[in-house]
Structure formats: structure tokens, C-alpha cells
């Protein structure tokens, strides 16, 4: 599960903060 979470978290942060 950890690899999936580590992959999703950055995407969520990118969408929320709009800073990629």
C-alpha cells in the first residue's frame, strides 16, 4: 500500500497547491 500512497500524495498536493 505504501508505494501507492507515496504515488498519490504528491499528486494530491500538486492539485491542491497547484505547484508541481
UniProtKB/Swiss-Prot annotation:
GO terms for cellular component: extracellular region. Pfam families: Antimicrobial_1. It comes from the Eukaryota. GO terms for biological process: defense response to bacterium; innate immune response. It is found in: Secreted. Antimicrobial peptide. This is Brevinin-1LT.
Amino acid at each position: 500500500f505504501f508505494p501507492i500512497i507515496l504515488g498519490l500524495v504528491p499528486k494530491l498536493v500538486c492539485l491542491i497547491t497547484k505547484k508541481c
